[in-house]
Swiss-Prot record:
Disulfide bonds join C37-C209, C50-C72, C63-C105, C86-C122, C216-C286. Glycans are attached at N58, N69, N100, N104, N292. It comes from Mus musculus (Mouse). Residues 168-175, 243-255, 319-340, 394-459 are cytoplasmic. G protein-coupled receptor activated by the neuropeptides vasoactive intestinal peptide (VIP) and pituitary adenylate cyclase-activating polypeptide (ADCYAP1/PACAP). Binds VIP and both PACAP27 and PACAP38 bioactive peptides with the following order of ligand affinity VIP = PACAP27 > PACAP38. Ligand binding causes a conformation change that triggers signaling via guanine nucleotide-binding proteins (G proteins) and modulates the activity of downstream effectors. Activates cAMP-dependent pathway. This is Vasoactive intestinal polypeptide receptor 1. The gene is Vipr1.
Length: 459
């Protein structure tokens, strides 16, 4: 005797909709139509495998293999109880430990599910009651509004910063070129978030469960590439500053192309590997969920390595700064070396991405709401902070803007006749690239001291 069951198609549709509403703590992605497709495709794959195995089995005196629309129950002799973990579909939203389901094989067939229906046996009632539907909706709307504002503000400020560093030729130097690539990585990351949201949460009438979801997969791949490139350009910032302070003589042009390869090339290699692996081993849905965690180490591993290297560089830079802040000839106007070290450290922490450590090492079972706020809302403002630190608070940028403002103020709106004599980037004084080249004419110790002063002046 088999327990009554709903028709498979109806069962699966009801389940997908119920889980998307009941398991809100999984994050805003729980409402994604593509994630519902992943659940349906996963269950369909398990169903086909179970039915194929059942057809190959011989008749037994016990209970034969059975598919109950969610779980495949193995062949079992009479009088035995089969205990299984809750289906993986319930664990996709958040790790659920300690919940099991069981059936007893009797002479009449399989018994009813114990300790009750799936939503009770797997603890969905407890999770759904922790936050009612209205509170969940308000929370997710607030999170989406928060990171939309953050990424929009970051995008606008980064575009302005890129324009400033591009238009003024006096600001063209290796250091600012690297800053511009870092800005671009944040711009692409913000753009990728908006594109991914459009692809994942499009409420149109498209058949999201069909194979015509290449655009959604491409959006997720682009998003993952932008995130990894963002980490690696933070690593490049650290490598450049460490080289500037620790190496007496080096070819900035040769090093710069190496930085380009690290910042944009290395992430593309790992993303291509990850894409190929997903196509062959996990090609269902929109690729925006973690089903096989081992595959995600192709992305997570290089990011964690870049964070580790940045942390090591951070310690080395702090050591160099302490040594360079002690000599009395570096600057006697500051109140104390420790105050300047504190200012430099505040600049280096976002530069080296140490703040990413807390995000990368959050445990999987950490409270989803708190993790979501940190990763989405707080992380969305990082581009804005970077633009403030490396452009708007840059002393050279401020001096150039003041000089241009004074020229515009004196000449007036129509006084551009002298523009041919004073082009956009033309200005008196030494450019930042000339400052670096002039360091080769002095001793290595004096060059390191001057380089250090140039970097600290950015604070």
């Amino acid at each position: 005797m088999r327990p009554p069951s709903l028709p498979p198609a109806r069962w699966l549709c009801v389940l997908a909709g119920a889980l998307a509403c009941a398991l809100g703590p999984a994050g805003s992605r729980a409402a994604s139509p593509h994630q519902e497709c992943e659940y349906l495709q996963m269950i369909e794959k398990q169903r086909q495998q179970c039915l194929e195995e059942a057809q190959l089995e011989n008749e037994t005196t016990g209970c034969s293999k059975m598919w109950d629309n969610l779980t495949c129950w193995p062949t079992t002799p009479w009088g035995q109880v089969v205990v299984l973990d809750c289906p993986l579909i319930f664990q996709l939203f958040s790790p659920i430990h300690g919940y099991n389901i069981s059936r007893n094989c009797t002479e009449e067939g399989w018994s009813q599910l114990e300790p009750g229906p799936y939503h009770i046996a797997c603890g969905l009632n407890d999770r759904a009651s922790s936050m009612d539907e209205q509170q969940q909706t308000e929370f997710y709307d607030a999170v989406k509004t928060g990171y939309t504002i953050g990424y929009s503000l970051s995008l606008a400020s980064l575009l302005v910063a890129m324009a400033i560093l591009s238009l003024f030729r006096k600001l063209h130097c290796t250091r600012n070129y690297i800053h511009m690539h870092l800005f671009m990585s944040f711009i692409l990351r913000a753009t990728a978030v908006f594109i991914k949201d459009m692809a994942l949460f499009n409420n149109g009438e498209t058949d999201h469960c069909s194979e015509a979801s290449v655009s959604c997969k491409a959006a997720v791949v682009f998003f993952q590439y932008c995130v990894m490139a963002n980490f690696f350009w933070l690593l490049v910032e650290g490598l450049y500053l460490h080289t500037l302070l620790a190496v007496s003589f080096f070819s900035e042009r040769k090093y710069f192309w190496g930085y380009i390869l690290i910042g944009w090339g290395v992430p593309s290699v790992f993303i291509m590997i990850w894409t190929i692996v997903r196509i062959h081993f996990e090609d269902f849905g929109c690729w925006d969920t973690i089903i096989n965690s081992s595959l995600w180490w192709i992305i997570k591993g290089p990011i964690l390595i870049s964070i580790l290297v940045n942390f090591i560089l951070f310690i080395c830079i702090i050591r160099i700064l302490v040594q360079k802040l002690r000599p009395p000839d570096i600057g006697k106007n500051d109140s104390s070396p420790y105050s300047r070290l504190a200012k430099s450290t505040l600049l280096l922490i976002p530069l080296f991405g140490v703040h990413y450590v807390m995000f990368a090492f959050f445990p999987d079972n950490f409270k989803a709401q708190v993790k979501m706020v940190f990763e989405l809302v707080v992380g969305s403002f990082q581009g804005f902070v970077v633009a403030i630190l490396y452009c708007f608070l840059n002393g050279e940028v401020q001096a150039e803007l003041r000089r241009k403002w004074r020229r515009w103020h004196l000449q007036g709106v129509l006084g551009w006749s002298s523009k041919s004599q004073h082009p956009w980037g033309g200005s008196n004084g030494v450019s930042c690239s000339t400052q670096v080249s002039m360091l080769t004419r002095v001793s290595p110790s004096a060059r390191r001291s001057s380089s250090f002063q140039a970097e600290v002046s950015l604070v």
